[in-house]
Amino acid sequence: MNKPICSTGLRWLWLAVVVVILDISSKQWVMAHFALYESVPLIPFFNLTYAQNFGAAFSFLADKSGWQRWFFAGIAIGISVVLMVMMYRSTAKQRLINCAYALIIGGALGNLYDRLVHGAVNDFLDFYINNWHFPTFNLADVAICIGAALVIFEGFLSPVEKNAVNNDE
């Protein structure tokens, strides 16, 4: 039996749309205003640095022959579909987990757009301490990490705490 979308976790997909819009817009701005590998210091531990990543997190598999572009695109699509099915099976009142899934979906689709349109993921957030730089990342990566952290957090909640977090009152 079909249930109304508004009563399912899919009601929270608007958050994924917001993530995709913010991610793509921020990357477009960086690509329009920066040359590749150009870096602009903003504060003592943070630069905007335009970089491209042909792999996954921490440039995993970036040095391969190009097959990884399609491999990671397939993973992004697969994860997004699985999470949307999970959202459909949940209720709209399960806010925490559905927001977590929406953040992950939005991040995955933002990076998927880059892979399909640009052939690589465009990164620009560059945090560092002295001469050590954390791998450059983007807003999609931030959304994925926050979403994953929320999934883990939700897993530690007791059933009573889950009801309190998801209570509409």
UniProtKB/Swiss-Prot annotation:
Coiled coil: none
Known EC number: 3.4.23.36
Claim: Cell membrane is one of the keywords in the record: yes
Residues the record marks as active site: 123, 141
Annotated membrane topology: Multi-pass membrane protein
InterPro entries: Peptidase_A8 (IPR001872)
Entry's transmembrane regions: 4-24, 29-49, 70-90, 101-121, 137-157
Example of a GO cellular component annotation carried by this entry: plasma membrane
Pathway entry: Protein modification; lipoprotein biosynthesis (signal peptide cleavage)
GO BP terms: proteolysis
Assigned keywords, A-Z: Aspartyl protease, Cell inner membrane, Cell membrane, Hydrolase, Membrane, Protease, Transmembrane, Transmembrane helix
Catalytic function, reaction form: Release of signal peptides from bacterial membrane prolipoproteins. Hydrolyzes -Xaa-Yaa-Zaa-|-(S,diacylglyceryl)Cys-, in which Xaa is hydrophobic (preferably Leu), and Yaa (Ala or Ser) and Zaa (Gly or Ala) have small, neutral side chains
Keyword Cell wall biogenesis/degradation: no
Subcellular compartments: Cell inner membrane
Lineage: superkingdom: Bacteria
Function: This protein specifically catalyzes the removal of signal peptides from prolipoproteins.
NCBIfam families according to UniProt: lspA
Family: Belongs to the peptidase A8 family.
Name of this protein: Lipoprotein signal peptidase
Protein source organism: Yersinia pestis
